[in-house]
Regions:
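His/Asp/Glu-enriched, well-ordered alpha-helical/loop segment
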Residues: 48-59, 66-89, 93-94, 100-103, ...
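Hydrophobic pocket-lining residues within nucleotide cofactor-binding pockets
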Residues: 10, 96-97
Length: 171
């Protein structure tokens, strides 16, 4: 046929600056609203499993550390359900990643896609983020792509790279 899809993009959460990143711990700036994923967990898992079963690549937008964690859980479940499949699933815009999830990317063969422009933000933007997360949490979890380079295909900048230069702000 004329049209063929090879992947599915699923948005699980949005940017922390708007209090829309799905987090393991609350924001530190006094925000008391509840952040929910775009899709309920069970529905997201069903979508991932169905796409995986059909041989489609999943590209899931997971900015917050809870979104990353649940995205990895969904990929792990799909892998157990369809063990013999070749796959190349991605978590995109991975801005916050908890320590316990770092090795899971390698174990599951999941690519953690990041945005180089956001990985090296302007000083004012970092100050804003420090208001949303305490400095220790921000330093520990924010953009692991800057500090966790290692052998393996799991840290390529990709989803937004065509719009973001390697040298943000020409630094």
């Amino acid at each position: 046929g004329f049209f063929r899809a090879g992947s599915v993009k699923l948005i699980m959460n949005l940017v922390p600056e708007a209090h829309q990143a799905w987090l393991l711990e609350p924001y530190c700036d006094g925000y008391e609203g509840e952040v929910k994923p775009v899709f309920p967990i069970e529905e997201m898992r069903e979508i991932v499993a169905a796409a995986d079963r059909l041989g489609l690549q999943m590209n899931m937008v997971t900015i917050g550390d809870r979104a990353v964690h649940e995205g990895l859980n969904a990929y792990e479940l799909a892998t157990r359900e369809n063990p013999e499949m070749l796959r190349r699933h991605t978590l995109e815009h991975t801005e916050l990643i908890a320590d316990e999830d770092l090795e899971r990317f390698v174990t599951l063969g999941v690519t953690a896609d990041f945005n180089p422009m956001v990985s090296y933000p302007e000083e004012g933007h970092m100050e804003h983020l420090e208001g949303l997360f305490d400095t220790e949490r921000l330093n520990a979890r924010y953009h692991r792509g800057r500090t966790s380079w290692r052998p393996g295909p799991w840290w390529p900048p990709g989803a937004t790279t065509p719009w973001c230069p390697w040298t943000p702000s020409c630094r």
